[in-house]
Swiss-Prot record:
Residues 2-29, 98-121, 181-192, 239-251, 319-374 are cytoplasmic. GO terms for cellular component: endoplasmic reticulum membrane. Glycans are attached at N56. The lineage of its organism: Eukaryota, Metazoa, Chordata, Craniata, Vertebrata. The modification Phosphoserine is found at S365. Residues 51-76, 143-159, 214-217, 273-297 are lumenal. Residues 117-326 form the TLC domain. This is Translocating chain-associated membrane protein 1. GO terms for biological process: protein insertion into ER membrane; response to unfolded protein; SRP-dependent cotranslational protein targeting to membrane, translocation. Keywords: Endoplasmic reticulum, Glycoprotein, Membrane, Phosphoprotein, Protein transport, Translocation, Transmembrane, Transmembrane helix, Transport. InterPro entries: TLC-dom, Translocation_assoc_membrane. Involved in the translocation of nascent protein chains into or through the endoplasmic reticulum (ER) membrane by facilitating the proper chain positioning at the SEC61 channel. Regulates the exposure of nascent secretory protein chain to the cytosol during translocation into the ER. May affect the phospholipid bilayer in the vicinity of the lateral gate of the SEC61 channel, thereby facilitating ER protein transport. Intimately associates with transmembrane (TM) domain of nascent membrane proteins during the entire integration process into the ER membrane. Residues 334-374 are annotated as: Disordered.
Length: 374
């Protein structure tokens, strides 16, 4: 494996190139400041806001729930500090995966610049989607979402969350916020930035919406479903870069993508359109976190439906482009045998090809001309 030679001239401190080359180390130092702040009593109160989850409530043990009391969490303005800290952690993890995994594979495969950037994007996203799917599935199983689907809308508002649930949403927001500085760190092309901003903005809009409107149960199920389909796409693209004949993963992804959009719409309509619409408490109450009113329900369903329609439109365009490229690349060349007839006209037609196309017999070889002259 070739070792990259480090340039003798180091860029000036705090210059553009210096920040790009050492951004992971700089961010690590900033994160370390918050962790060191926990060690001193004067700064511990401020540092703990960034590092640990805030707004916990301890519920006493009941007769149904034996033995121990439980700690639940709700959201507040201090969550922004926690999201900021874990955004720094996401930048560090991103750099570790890039340097110790993706860069090593890139040096072995010798990708072009276009494939290099797409491979890095799929490598980072496939790792994140896989981790989020496993984590989200664990929460779904531990909190009995699979055995009792009515928990999606029953006992709304779901303003109290378990530690795993709140930490999951904090991590999701932190990851997608970290994608903004990564556009600068990864030297994203100007023409690709608008597409990336729309992509990141849609994730933040829906995750933050589910978190703030106390629809965290529905949001978790939809995220796990969506992330699984996206993971399959990006892992298939990684295999495609190593072997361009690989198409099985894309075929499976195409089927699951459509099914995922249908399941998303069904679960959303079932939860918001029927479950919450039949709930007894339908009054807007900010203090209790109750947003179960007609206007909010319509806005939630409209945003989900518009997003799914936008994704289907992008999917159809993507599939049409792939099929068009595949058909032009593998278009069969039909060869017709020239009809041998007497006279000069048939010989002239053979030289010019059949039906305007040049064939393998389009011109006599020197050997044939010699035989004819003899």
């Amino acid at each position: 494996m070739a070792i990259r030679k480090k340039s003798t001239k180091s860029p000036p401190v705090l210059s553009h190139e210096f920040i790009l080359q050492n951004h992971a180390d700089i961010v690590s130092c900033v994160a370390m400041v918050f962790l060191l702040g926990l060690m001193f009593e004067i700064t511990a109160k401020a540092s703990i806001i960034f590092v640990t989850l805030q707004y916990n409530v301890t519920l006493p043990a009941t007769e149904e729930q034996a033995t121990e009391s439980t700690s639940l969490y709700y959201y507040g303005i201090k969550d922004l500090a926690t999201v900021f800290f874990y955004m720094l952690v996401a930048i560090i993890i991103h750099a570790i995966i890039q340097e110790y995994v993706l860069d090593k594979i890139n040096r072995r495969m010798h990708f072009s610049k276009t494939k290099h950037s797409k491979f890095n994007e799929s490598g980072q996203l496939s790792a994140f989607y896989l981790f989020s799917c496993i984590w989200g599935t664990f929460i779904l199983i531990s909190e009995n979402y699979i055995s009792d689907p009515t928990i999606l809308w029953r006992a709304y508002p779901h303003n109290l969350m378990t530690f795993q649930m709140k930490f999951f949403y904090i991590a999701q927001l932190a990851y997608w916020f970290h994608a903004f500085p990564e556009l600068y760190f990864q030297k994203t092309k100007k023409e690709d930035i608008p597409r990336q901003l729309v992509y990141i903005g849609l994730y933040l809009f829906h995750i933050a919406g589910a978190y703030l409107l106390n629809l965290n149960h529905l949001g978790l199920v939809l995220l796990v479903l969506h992330y699984f389909v996206e993971f399959l796409f990006h892992i298939s693209r990684l295999f495609y870069f190593s072997d361009e004949k690989y198409q099985k993963g894309f075929s499976l992804w195409a089927v699951l993508f459509v099914l995922g959009r249908l399941l998303t719409l069904i679960l959303s309509v079932l939860t918001v359109g029927f479950g919450l619409a039949r709930a007894e408490n339908q009054k807007l109450d900010f203090s209790a976190g109750n947003f179960n009113v007609l206007a909010v329900r319509i806005a939630v369903l409209a945003s989900i439906c518009i997003t799914q329609a936008f994704m289907m439109w992008k999917f159809i365009n993507f599939q049409l482009r792939r099929w068009r490229e595949h058909s032009t690349f593998q278009a069969p060349v039909v060869k017709k045998k020239p009809t041998v007839t007497k006279g000069r006209s048939s010989r002239k037609g053979t030289e010019n090809g059949v039906n305007g196309t040049v064939t393998s017999n389009g011109a006599d070889s020197p050997r044939n001309r010699k035989e004819k002259s003899s």
